Amino acid sequence: MNIAIVCYSTFGGSGVVATELGVALAQKGYQIHFITYGQPVRLSAFHKNIHLHQVYVEEYPLFRYQPYELALSSKMVEVVREYNIDIIHAHYAIPHAYTAFMAKEILRKEGLEVKIIT
């Protein structure tokens, strides 16, 4: 099974829990794809079943804060298409759960179905 885990990559609790969950699932043989803006701090060792997909946000001078949500949902769509993801685990409601929903709707229009859990 191919699982995408979308999380914050910082020291905070949700990022730690999501990373530890991903590592445990990878050790059981699942293919884990972390989608985040940086390497999770608790992801310190290489594992053949763990893949990191970094979200890059382009600088655009019109915006005070760059549109991370759009870049994140686009990266989710890309990863689901390329790696045949079965489940997106969106480990935080805002912005991860609603960007996962946006990605799911884009993929549905292409005939691809992916489950989301939060």
Locate predicted features.
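A structural micro-motif
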Residues: 1, 30, 50, 114-115
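Active-site proximal beta-strand in glycosyltransferases
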Residues: 3, 87, 102-118
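N-terminal strand-loop element at the rim of the active site
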Residues: 7-11, 23-68
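Conserved alpha-helical elements of sugar-nucleotide-dependent glycosyltransferases
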Residues: 13-21
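Short, well-ordered alpha-helical microsegments
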Residues: 15, 41, 96-98
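An amphipathic, basic-hydrophobic alpha-helix
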Residues: 62-87, 97-102
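Active-site beta-loop-alpha junctions enriched in small/polar residues
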Residues: 93
